[in-house]
Protein backbone atom coordinates (compact mmCIF):
# COMPACT_ATOMS: atom_id res chain seq x y z
CA UNK A 1 0.00 0.00 0.00
CA UNK A 2 1.16 3.50 -0.75
CA UNK A 3 -0.14 7.03 -0.67
CA UNK A 4 0.70 9.79 -3.07
CA UNK A 5 -0.01 13.44 -2.37
CA UNK A 6 -0.13 15.66 -5.42
CA UNK A 7 -0.30 19.35 -4.47
CA UNK A 8 -1.18 22.08 -6.92
CA UNK A 9 -3.71 22.59 -9.66
CA UNK A 10 -6.15 19.69 -9.74
CA UNK A 11 -6.46 19.49 -13.52
CA UNK A 12 -2.70 19.15 -13.97
CA UNK A 13 -2.45 16.74 -11.06
CA UNK A 14 -5.22 14.46 -12.33
CA UNK A 15 -3.85 14.28 -15.86
CA UNK A 16 -0.46 13.23 -14.46
CA UNK A 17 -1.85 10.11 -12.76
CA UNK A 18 -1.00 6.89 -14.61
CA UNK A 19 -2.73 4.25 -12.48
CA UNK A 20 -6.11 3.78 -10.82
CA UNK A 21 -6.45 4.86 -7.21
CA UNK A 22 -8.54 3.32 -4.43
CA UNK A 23 -9.10 6.65 -2.68
CA UNK A 24 -9.14 10.24 -3.84
CA UNK A 25 -9.13 12.86 -1.08
CA UNK A 26 -10.23 16.24 -2.43
CA UNK A 27 -9.19 19.20 -0.31
CA UNK A 28 -9.63 22.14 -2.67
CA UNK A 29 -9.98 25.78 -1.69
CA UNK A 30 -13.34 25.62 0.05
CA UNK A 31 -15.16 28.39 -1.79
CA UNK A 32 -13.76 27.77 -5.26
CA UNK A 33 -16.36 25.24 -6.47
CA UNK A 34 -13.93 22.73 -7.98
CA UNK A 35 -15.78 19.61 -6.90
CA UNK A 36 -17.92 19.04 -10.00
CA UNK A 37 -14.96 19.38 -12.38
CA UNK A 38 -12.76 17.14 -10.19
CA UNK A 39 -15.39 14.40 -10.13
CA UNK A 40 -15.89 14.69 -13.90
CA UNK A 41 -12.17 14.40 -14.61
CA UNK A 42 -11.76 11.42 -12.28
CA UNK A 43 -14.60 9.65 -14.09
CA UNK A 44 -13.62 10.68 -17.64
CA UNK A 45 -9.99 9.66 -17.10
CA UNK A 46 -11.04 6.36 -15.43
CA UNK A 47 -8.79 7.09 -12.45
CA UNK A 48 -10.84 5.45 -9.69
CA UNK A 49 -10.45 1.72 -8.98
CA UNK A 50 -13.59 -0.41 -9.26
CA UNK A 51 -14.42 -0.29 -5.53
CA UNK A 52 -12.73 3.06 -4.94
CA UNK A 53 -14.09 6.10 -3.14
CA UNK A 54 -13.80 9.85 -3.38
CA UNK A 55 -13.66 11.82 -0.15
CA UNK A 56 -14.57 15.47 -0.60
CA UNK A 57 -13.68 17.77 2.29
CA UNK A 58 -15.83 20.90 2.61
CA UNK A 59 -17.32 23.30 5.12
CA UNK A 60 -20.64 22.62 6.84
CA UNK A 61 -22.29 25.51 4.98
CA UNK A 62 -21.89 23.66 1.66
CA UNK A 63 -24.43 20.95 0.95
CA UNK A 64 -22.82 18.44 -1.37
CA UNK A 65 -25.34 16.77 -3.71
CA UNK A 66 -26.37 13.13 -3.26
CA UNK A 67 -25.30 12.46 -6.87
CA UNK A 68 -22.46 14.17 -8.69
CA UNK A 69 -21.10 13.30 -12.14
CA UNK A 70 -22.21 9.66 -11.84
CA UNK A 71 -20.99 9.24 -8.26
CA UNK A 72 -23.31 8.65 -5.30
CA UNK A 73 -22.79 9.97 -1.77
CA UNK A 74 -22.68 6.98 0.58
CA UNK A 75 -21.57 8.63 3.84
CA UNK A 76 -21.07 12.00 5.41
CA UNK A 77 -19.06 12.75 8.55
CA UNK A 78 -18.95 16.10 10.36
CA UNK A 79 -15.95 17.31 12.35
CA UNK A 80 -16.64 20.78 13.74
CA UNK A 81 -16.91 23.14 10.76
CA UNK A 82 -15.59 20.52 8.30
CA UNK A 83 -17.52 17.75 6.56
CA UNK A 84 -16.19 14.72 4.71
CA UNK A 85 -18.60 13.54 2.01
CA UNK A 86 -17.77 10.07 0.73
CA UNK A 87 -18.76 9.01 -2.79
CA UNK A 88 -18.52 5.89 -4.89
CA UNK A 89 -19.34 5.30 -8.52
CA UNK A 90 -23.08 4.83 -8.96
CA UNK A 91 -24.60 1.64 -10.27
CA UNK A 92 -26.07 1.56 -13.77
CA UNK A 93 -29.63 1.21 -12.41
CA UNK A 94 -29.40 4.49 -10.46
Please name every model-derived segment.
Residues 1-94:
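Class I S-adenosyl-L-methionine-dependent methyltransferase catalytic core
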Amino acid sequence: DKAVIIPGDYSKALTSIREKADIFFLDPPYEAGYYENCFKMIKDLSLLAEDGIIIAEHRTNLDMPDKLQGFVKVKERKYGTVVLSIYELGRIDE
